[in-house]
């Protein structure tokens, strides 16, 4: 036994030597730029994003290596919008197994399925309920839990402060509102997070994403005693699963006693049928999975985008003034602005949202795709079948071949330029774009429009980040972030404060 153990270092050394030799001289990706460590281990890229500033890390990779580089063994990252469209529009490319980590109790959602047939079937089932027409029928419910809830909260705080002004944490309030909204839509229940400043359900949802992600990337933590590290996250995950199952059961019991069906996403999921295979509906587990997926994917991303719009507008007061004037010149203070009115009458606001999606670090990761049957030539390099192709969103959004002065925050680049909008991939692209895109844009637009219509906003005098705090390029510094499933403010209690007063 001792003799065998003496050979272990030699075996490890020979294995490492072979891996390095293969990656540098024999791999089909050997001519593509990239770090040697990235070629040797997939954990290198993950740890680099988690331990450092994730968005800046992947931006730096694009700036150093260019439009294509190796970011993991048998995997490349691409950043040119034309290449990205080629991959996303090809039926040969599908999501990779990494999406398994967000499956719920073994069930893939429309956001995580790797099966093209299942993805198409689910789109046929629930896609009609997420178009502008059906969302318009749910807009009253969406308004109730987002715009009107924030208004009630801020008006109460202003009244308690004597009616002058009040400092709020806009990140918390936007997050509470979007979680309450998706909770009402996808579960048919009231979280009351914003009303009560209650983070209970939000902690369940945050723990769910964290628990599923860590289990996938660090499987050793599934085993005892290491599993104790994740115990609190597992318990919150299990509470969320139980809550979700209970929501489906409650709704089905309700339907047996009342005739009128509620107008929300939970009911849509229950009623959804595949037009190519009528009368086949989703099972209770599938309804639960889609409801949870909508909460995971929809609440966090929407609240973060909304918060980043506010953050960037306060850093660039000239754009805040323009978008506020656009809104107030067309709507009276008492008018509740709808999503249709936002789309028709507020092009500058829409431009600010698109520029936020391009400029801000909403996610620190990639969108990985793979084809097992089709090779592809990208930037002069042939990528054989079986190689993962990951879309570097940050590289695409600052790509010097596409954007003029990409390092600058400039919403005007989107005014009257539909091609610029097509070069933003925050919601993916084409027939495979995020199915919740319309809902997310509705929430973002109506919240920002109605807030700026009714309230004056400004930064507190002691804010660390503002127009005065600039970097070497003269740009206002954005608040520091931390990376998880999404990129969140690192110090929200310090950096997400806003002075709110009634419109003058």
Swiss-Prot record:
GO terms for molecular function: heme binding; iron ion binding; monooxygenase activity; oxidoreductase activity, acting on paired donors, with incorporation or reduction of molecular oxygen. Gene3D superfamilies: Cytochrome P450. Pathway: Mycotoxin biosynthesis. Keywords: Heme, Iron, Metal-binding, Monooxygenase, Oxidoreductase, Signal. Residues 1-23 form the signal peptide. PROSITE patterns: CYTOCHROME_P450. It is an enzyme of class 1 (oxidoreductase). Its cofactor is heme. InterPro entries: Cyt_P450, Cyt_P450_CS, Cyt_P450_E_grp-I, Cyt_P450_sf, Cytochrome_P450_monoxygenase. Induction: Expression is under the control of the secondary metabolism regulator laeA. Heme binds at residue 434. Cytochrome P450 monooxygenase; part of the gene cluster that mediates the biosynthesis of helvolic acid, an antibacterial nortriterpenoid. Protostadienol synthase helA cyclizes (3S)-oxidosqualene to (17Z)-protosta-17(20),24-dien-3-beta-ol (protostadienol). The synthesis of protostadienol is followed by several steps of monooxygenation, dehydrogenation, and acyl transfer to yield the final helvolic acid. PANTHER family: CYTOCHROME P450, CYTOCHROME P450 MONOOXYGENASE APDB-RELATED. This is Cytochrome P450 monooxygenase helB4. It comes from Aspergillus fumigatus (strain ATCC MYA-4609 / CBS 101355 / FGSC A1100 / Af293) (Neosartorya fumigata).
């Amino acid at each position: 036994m001792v003799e065998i153990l003496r050979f272990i270092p030699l075996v490890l050394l020979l294995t490492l030597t072979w891996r390095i030799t293969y990656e540098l001289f024999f791999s089909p990706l050997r001519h593509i730029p990239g770090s040697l460590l990235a070629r040797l281990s997939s954990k290198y890229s993950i740890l680099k994003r988690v331990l450092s500033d994730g968005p800046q890390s992947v931006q730096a990779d694009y700036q150093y290596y260019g439009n294509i580089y190796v970011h993991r063994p048998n995997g490349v990252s691409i950043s040119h919008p034309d290449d990205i469209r080629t991959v996303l529009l090809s039926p040969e490319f599908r999501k990779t197994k990494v999406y398994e980590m967000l499956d719920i109790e073994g069930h893939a959602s429309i956001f995580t399925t790797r099966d093209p047939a299942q993805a198409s079937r689910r789109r046929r089932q629930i896609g009609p309920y997420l178009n502008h027409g059906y969302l318009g029928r749910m807009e009253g419910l969406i308004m109730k839990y987002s715009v009107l809830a924030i208004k009630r909260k801020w008006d109460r705080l202003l009244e308690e402060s004597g009616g002058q002004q009040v400092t709020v944490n806009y990140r918390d309030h936007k997050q509470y509102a979007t979680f309450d909204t998706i909770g009402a839509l996808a579960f048919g229940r009231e979280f009351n997070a914003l009303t009560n400043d209650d983070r209970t359900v939000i902690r369940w949802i945050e723990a769910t994403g964290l628990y599923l992600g860590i289990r996938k990337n660090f499987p050793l933590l599934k085993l005892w005693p290491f599993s104790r590290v994740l115990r609190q996250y597992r318990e919150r995950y299990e509470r969320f699963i139980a809550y979700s199952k209970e929501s489906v059961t409650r709704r089905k019991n309700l339907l047996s006693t009342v005739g009128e069906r509620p107008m929300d996403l939970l009911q849509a999921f229950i009623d959804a049928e595949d037009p190519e295979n009528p009368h086949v509906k989703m099972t209770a587990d599938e309804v639960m999975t889609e409801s949870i997926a909508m909460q995971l994917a929809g609440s966090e991303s929407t609240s973060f985008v909304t918060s980043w719009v506010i953050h960037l507008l306060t850093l660039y007061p000239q754009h805040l003034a323009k978008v506020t004037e656009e809104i107030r010149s067309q709507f009276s203070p008492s008018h509740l602005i709808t999503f249709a009115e936002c789309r028709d009458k507020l092009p500058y606001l829409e431009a600010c949202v698109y520029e936020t999606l391009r400029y801000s670090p909403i996610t620190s990761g990639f969108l990985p795709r793979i084809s097992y049957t089709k090779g592809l030539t990208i930037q002069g390099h042939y990528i054989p079948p079986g190689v993962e192709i990951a879309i570097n969103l940050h590289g695409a959004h600052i790509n010097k071949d596409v954007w003029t002065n990409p390092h600058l925050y400039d919403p005007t680049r989107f005014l009257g330029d539909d091609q610029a909008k097509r070069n933003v991939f925050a919601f993916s692209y084409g027939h495979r774009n995020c199915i919740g895109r319309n809902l997310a844009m509705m929430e973002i637009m109506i919240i920002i429009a109605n807030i700026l219509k009714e309230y004056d906003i400004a930064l507190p005098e002691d804010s660390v980040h503002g127009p005065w705090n600039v970097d070497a390029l003269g740009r206002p510094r954005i608040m520091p972030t931390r990376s998880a499933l999404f990129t969140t403010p690192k110090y929200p209690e310090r950096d997400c404060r806003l002075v709110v007063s009634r419109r003058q």
